[in-house]
Amino acid sequence: CSSDLPQIEVVQIQFNYADFDDPAVQAGKCYEICRKHGKQVIVMEPVRGGSLANLPDDAKAVFEELHGGSPATYAIRYAAGFPGIMMVLSGMSSLEQMKENVSFMKDFRPLDEREMKAVEKVREIFRGKNLIPCTGCRYCVDGCPKKISIPDLFACMNAKKIYQNTNSNVYYRVHTRNNGKASDCIKCGKCE
């Protein structure tokens, strides 16, 4: 099947356990398409911009029970453990983080069944955070008189609920720079 697209040798995708079945990112589906076409995959965002390293306490406790490394370790090993992954790009901001990443990638082993169950438990915790259900289809955006990028703002709110960090504030500012803010909504109902 790789002969279908001979000009493409490798594909780089955002791939991590939080985005695997996320309707906006669709990391799992992107990965499956790469594999269907026989393409090697380079992973970016295995720790989702640091969000999967700084988990809420209930999610962090799941990995702590395993006694096998930091949340970032599990996130990177999750991404690296899939067939066809040729490289995992992980941003690091300290020498300590680099040493940690090198230590478990040097003698790499994919997540075992117990660890995969822990990842799924963390994903269940994320899903239980009373998130705004949005597929990111963007149908609601077309009729908005205030040009509010509704799915992007929902994604920011969901990220804030899950990860409790300020990255979502940065993305909110990015998405509202040339579009309406949530507070600009006039409740016209065209998005319904």
Each model region followed by its residue ranges:
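Short, intrinsically disordered, charge-balanced linker/junction segments flanking boundaries
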Residues: 1-2, 188-192
